[in-house]
Amino acid sequence: MEAERLRLLEEEAKLKKVARMGFNASSMLRKSQLGFLNVTSYSRLANELRVSCMERKKVQIRSLDPSSLASDRFNFILASTNSDQLFVVNQVEVEGSKYGIISLRTLKIPSFHVYVLRNLYVPNRKVKSLCWASLNQLDSHVLLCFEGITDAPSCAVLLPASRFLSVHTRVNQPGMLCSFQIPEAWSCAWSLNTRAYHCFSAGLSQQVLLTSVATGHQQSFDTSSDVLAQQFASTAPLLFNGCRSGEIFAIDLRCRNRGKGWRATRLFHDSAVTSVQILQEEQCLMASDMTGKIKLWDLRATKCVRQYEGHVNESAYLPLHVHEEEGIVVAVGQDCYTRIWSLHDAHLLRTIPSPYSASEDDIPSVAFASRLGGIRGAAPGLLMAVRQDLYCFPFS
């Protein structure tokens, strides 16, 4: 495996030259105009060209705070909706974690540097799940689900993103800090659905817990398995859940009676479902599991219509990233390889090796930015965090 990783790293250095030999945008456009390429083939080849031309760039991390993240290992990164910031979880040498926000506004070609804003250190508490939350405005908060310890029960905390801004820029942005006592959560999701406005869901052991931030009211739905992945639909009144048993089911948010009628859709994988992603039209759902299967499901016909081969997972909780604008699917495997597929035909476009030897402790965390730095007109790009390093793979 190590020899394969080194071979791919060597090939990566030559990618730009290789990709341009007889395989460029102008020749593909000409073939399409002459009818030699249909729309599907043209789209796939265009994506393959852009993805194959992505070059790894080391990002310089600068700090506005003396307690810099630069010396701490990255555990997880999560891009905001507008791709202008990353929420990061870092492992520190003493027991506990650091949480912070990295501003991506300075991440531009050819200068690749970012700024770490203020950090918060939480000793002896581990986050089981997290997501962005839109309470006052888009991505105004981060929802963190902490596991319980001896003198502190498990809870869900809505942390204002403004808490991470410097003192000078935090004026008139107090934000609201909320805490809710809940059982330990495997997963969480924030709702933008009008049927569950200002609500979040927590996937628990054999239960889904829906909580209203405004009133504190909680509604539970009993399940037969641990809920490892969740996502609310934006328009349909549904909350999709992926379970350890391999079942994917939707909760109809219009049903107040927990006893019957709330289970709207049922799909099945052969292993624990670790990620669910609803596509924009809400007619399809993509899911990945602990056997490395990635499937695209037609929600109307309740059947699998496409599989994406090559992903490696045996026991890890690994997210799936779907980006419809670019027509790609991204996933990091337990073997530490980042793979990119064409969303439309499941063709494997690229396999990116980790800069470090494969290890359970060094699985990269990735995020895809539709506009690097959140700047209008900026190129999309892939961000990768591994150990203490942050890398960027901008689209050409």
Curated annotation (Swiss-Prot):
Q: Which UniProt keywords apply?
A: Cytoplasm, Repeat, WD repeat
Q: Does the keyword rRNA-binding apply?
A: no
Coiled-coil intervals, chain numbering: none
Which stretches are WD repeats? Answer: 268-307, 312-351
* InterPro entries with a match to the protein in the record: CUL4-DDB1_E3_ligase_receptor, WD40/YVTN_repeat-like_dom_sf, WD40_repeat_dom_sf, WD40_rpt
Location(s), subcellular: Cytoplasm
Give yes or no: UniProt keyword Repeat: yes
Name the UniProt record assigns to this protein = DDB1- and CUL4-associated factor 4-like protein 1
